[in-house]
Amino acid sequence: MPPVPLRTATFSTHTCARIVVVCCLLLALGVSSAAQQLPQRDNEKLLAPTPPMGWNSWDSYGENITEAQVRATAEWMAKHLKPYGWQYVVIDEGWYLANPGAKPADLKFVMDDSGRFLPDPSRYPSSVDGAGFKPLADYIHSLGLKFGIHIMRGIPREAVARNLRIAMSPYRASEAAIEDDTCPWNAFMYGVQPAPSGQAYYNSISTLYAQWGVDFIKADCIADHPYKADEMRMLALSIRYTERDIVLSVSPGPTSLEHAKEVSDYAEMWRISDDFWDHWGPLADKPWSQGIRAQFDTAAKWASFHVPGRWPDADMLPLGHFPHPGDGGEARDTHLTHDEQLTMMNLWCIFQSPLIVGGDLPTADDWTTKLLTNPEVIAVDQHASGRKPVVTNETDVVWTSKPEDGRGYYVAVFNLSEKDQTLTYDWTKLELPKATYSVRDLWSAKDLGDATSLMVKLRPHASALYWVVARP
């Protein structure tokens, strides 16, 4: 497909001047030293003061989603989920492919004359004539929501083969690329040099995304296998200098705890596991796929990490229906039982993971909708602190956290076994002060009365979520 012309970006004189200044600094100092400390935002504004909540297209559509489907999803979210805090609509991988699903050697890309991917106009008709994602982003913003896209780290190999000039710079694509560095599962990108030429390319794409009105970037092949700190810094720096508030999410997992400080300097959220899908235990035919049981162990490793506005990400919530599943196969509903779906929600919320739904929203049934619209459960994810596991056995796990207002505790109890269990805990066993506590079930929104200890009857893979407050 021939390159698509791009409308000229319009920025304030101040913004253009800042972009020029940063490029000059990078030329003088080198990327590695200049990018170690990102320039501060005004008043150190947190772009994600609470865990981001939204929807991502991958679980439902893989690379095959269309503009019509994105718009329908945004409309459903605005009507049903927005009042509960859900706000991001994110298009995952492949929006620039003219032939999604083709063999890797046959993939056809849509890009401009500066080597920047553009939406495929056959699937995103509002992007014609170089409009890019701006019309779609404008529509999503008109609904009171925010718009996000997935990118692969690096620069397109096709841009390097054609040696295209990088926008707003004296460099060409071949000067920015590391041609022996490709992503293990998507080889159509080259890594980018930790040098002014590489920074120039990241500046060029972030400038374009800011022009479109992007609010969220999910950057892939950067957080683990392989971990690319230099490219993460360059991307974060380029986003900062657009002067647009853009949340940065990095993938895939498992992000190493050794990199926690560095990653949290540059991204608002990062994946803690391999791709999470709708199963309990490991799958022999998909060893890369993380199930719920393993996610308990992964979350526990990150429990002590607490940085304001930075969120370890347990991955998307595979709920509801998948018309074109991102993990392959025919259209299907989630494989998780109702008990397992509740357990997933309870773990994500008590852990305070970002909540990013993966299922198809316009076809969501009443059960799925209710899972996503319980304000008391959502508050556990959004408005708590001090999350930690206090019981970690092979058969049962308990987490606690404290509500934002300091009144009482949230307690999540999980049966990890394959049989019914009656679990009893003294409050002190849960690291709570010895007292009589009033107990409220957050899913049923019912007060259960006072208790001197906690007793819970749970089916296999089931869980419960409570708010408990000590009596005077």
Describe the residue ranges of each PLM region.
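Structural recognition of the beta-strand scaffold that forms the well-ordered cores
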Residues: 52-57, 87-92, 97, 146-151, ...
